[in-house]
């Protein structure tokens, strides 16, 4: 399929969610391939584009100089004709508490192919339901991308929680690599350290401390390791956040990978449960022997499909998201192939990914 030929993606494939839309539009921008998506979120209620999806699509279009048709709330089809990915400074508002992390997922692949340094400021939710937390993106996602030769900086200026939002995050790519290295994630290597970051904003700092104690206690019990703990809390008169919220990230740094687990608080949910959930997520994934946790098992294949060469991954869980994205990559990226070597849906898995070696256009 030539770069000028339209690729048609059925948005109802697999789980049929917003991740198909975000990933397809990002890939179209990288590949310079016009894209038509039909049946957008057909399995969701209500179907069609929601405001947070529009932000991702419009951000990709702005940075790649692309044209959009059908980019409106409720639309079940969309056409995107990309231009060239340009560096510079951009600013996007995700809405009251739309996930900043999901916008970063959409933008990160194409920022690597920018023709010059690029900086993007995002306003919205940093720690919201149904998405990785911003700390996960900073400590795990960015670390894994660095192992693929891609340095992406994620700086949090202010957190934003549901429903108020108002978080501010700056994403910088000072030296776009123009592609990615193939790399296998099968062996973890020696454990170098475990870390806990617990935050509470517009709330007593004792909540952040209770979350951290709960997470750290479980890590000590299961791993026999004392984690390094960081508490983020604010005095009431110096707290810049718009609304209350809490969250925890627990992450483990190994010689060959980084893995993490996160959780966010909500009204009525004890702080101890928040901390325990984050630690349990990491510890469950570590117990499988995998080198990529459940979140990165979803996200890493996009970069490995664009990389030059063969990568083998051992992921903690082949989620429905990951399975759908692998099929989308096969449709959109000429030359990409994959094989599931072991495991299956919702189980630990090993996969071989043969990347297409995509270079800047």
Swiss-Prot record:
ATP binds at residues 105, 295-298. GO terms for biological process: RNA processing. It is found in: Cytoplasm. It is an enzyme of class 6 (ligase). It comes from Aeropyrum pernix (strain ATCC 700893 / DSM 11879 / JCM 9820 / NBRC 100138 / K1). One of its GO terms (cellular component) is cytoplasm. Its EC number is 6.5.1.4. The active site is at residue 321. This is RNA 3'-terminal phosphate cyclase. Coiled coil: none annotated. Belongs to the RNA 3'-terminal cyclase family. Type 1 subfamily. Catalyzes the conversion of 3'-phosphate to a 2',3'-cyclic phosphodiester at the end of RNA. The mechanism of action of the enzyme occurs in 3 steps: (A) adenylation of the enzyme by ATP; (B) transfer of adenylate to an RNA-N3'P to produce RNA-N3'PP5'A; (C) and attack of the adjacent 2'-hydroxyl on the 3'-phosphorus in the diester linkage to produce the cyclic end product. The biological role of this enzyme is unknown but it is likely to function in some aspects of cellular RNA processing. SUPFAM superfamilies: EPT/RTPC-like, RNA 3'-terminal phosphate cyclase, RPTC, insert domain. Keywords: ATP-binding, Cytoplasm, Ligase, Nucleotide-binding. It comes from the Archaea. The lineage of its organism: Archaea, Thermoproteota, Thermoprotei, Desulfurococcales, Desulfurococcaceae. One of its GO terms (molecular function) is ATP binding. It catalyses: a 3'-end 3'-phospho-ribonucleotide-RNA + ATP = a 3'-end 2',3'-cyclophospho-ribonucleotide-RNA + AMP + diphosphate.
């Amino acid at each position: 399929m030539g770069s000028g030929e339209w690729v048609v993606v059925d948005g109802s494939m697999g789980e049929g969610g917003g991740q198909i839309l975000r990933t397809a539009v990002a890939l179209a921008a990288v590949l310079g391939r016009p894209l038509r998506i039909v049946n957008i979120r057909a399995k969701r209620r209500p179907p069609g584009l929601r405001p947070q999806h529009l932000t991702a699509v419009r951000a990709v279009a702005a940075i790649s100089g692309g044209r959009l048709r059908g980019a409106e709330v409720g639309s079940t089809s969309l056409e995107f004709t990309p231009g060239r990915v340009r560096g510079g400074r951009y600013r996007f508002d995700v809405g009251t508490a739309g996930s900043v992390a999901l916008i970063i997922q959409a933008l990160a692949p194409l920022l690597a192919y920018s023709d010059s340094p690029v900086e993007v400021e995002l306003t919205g939710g940093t720690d919201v339901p149904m998405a990785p937390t911003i700390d996960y993106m900073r400590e795990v996602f960015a670390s894994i991308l660095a192992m693929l030769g891609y340095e992406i900086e994620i700086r949090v200026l202010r957190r934003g929680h549901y429903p108020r939002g108002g978080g501010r995050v700056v994403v910088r790519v000072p030296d776009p690599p123009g592609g990615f290295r193939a790399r296998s994630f099968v062996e973890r290597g020696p454990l170098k350290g475990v870390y806990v970051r617990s935050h509470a904003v517009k709330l007593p700092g004792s909540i952040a401390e209770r979350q951290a104690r709960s997470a750290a206690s479980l890590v000590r019990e299961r791993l026999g390791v004392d984690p390094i703990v960081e508490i983020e809390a604010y005095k009431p008169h110096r707290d810049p956040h718009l609304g209350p919220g809490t969250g925890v990230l627990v992450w483990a740094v190994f010689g060959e990978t980084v893995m993490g687990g996160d959780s966010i608080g909500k009204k009525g949910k004890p702080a101890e449960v928040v901390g325990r959930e984050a630690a349990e997520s990491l510890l469950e994934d570590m117990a499988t022997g995998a080198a990529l946790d459940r979140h990165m098992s979803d996200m890493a294949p996009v970069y490995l499909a664009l990389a030059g060469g063969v990568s083998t991954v051992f992921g903690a869980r082949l989620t429905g998201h990951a399975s759908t994205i692998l099929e989308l990559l096969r449709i959109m990226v000429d030359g990409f192939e994959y094989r599931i070597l072991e495991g299956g849906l919702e189980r630990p898995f090993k996969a071989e990914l043969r990347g297409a070696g995509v270079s800047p256009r």
